[in-house]
């Protein structure tokens, strides 16, 4: 049984991924990463702007 498995492993050659396929995969991963960074930045900016508006409103109330 073990010999059979060893023979199978020897016969299987390493999987060769064509260069253009690898390139496409890298491009997809890169675009996903960029989108995620953009989303994070947008959310951060939105939170920052909301905080600024709250502070302005608070200032307006305290100084009529």
Curated annotation (Swiss-Prot):
Q: Which InterPro entries match?
A: HHV-5_US34A (IPR031384)
What keywords is this UniProt entry annotated with?
Answer: Host membrane, Membrane, Transmembrane, Transmembrane helix
Residue ranges annotated as transmembrane are: 15-37
Q: Topology with regard to the membrane?
A: Single-pass membrane protein
Would the keyword Transmembrane helix turn up in this protein's UniProt record? yes
Q: Does the keyword Transmembrane apply?
A: yes
Q: Where in the cell is it found?
A: Host membrane
Which GO cellular component terms, listed alphabetically, does the Swiss-Prot or TrEMBL entry include? Answer: host cell membrane; membrane
Q: Which family does it belong to?
A: Belongs to the HHV-5 US34A protein family.
Name by which UniProt lists this protein = Uncharacterized protein US34A
* Organism of provenance: Human cytomegalovirus (strain Merlin)
Q: Which gene encodes it?
A: US34A
């Amino acid at each position: 049984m073990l010999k059979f498995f060893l023979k199978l492993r020897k016969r299987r050659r390493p999987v060769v991924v064509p260069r253009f396929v690898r390139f496409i995969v890298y491009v997809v991963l890169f675009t996903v990463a960029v989108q995620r960074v953009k989303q994070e930045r947008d959310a951060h900016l939105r939170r920052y702007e909301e905080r600024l508006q709250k502070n302005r409103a608070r200032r307006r109330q305290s100084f009529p």
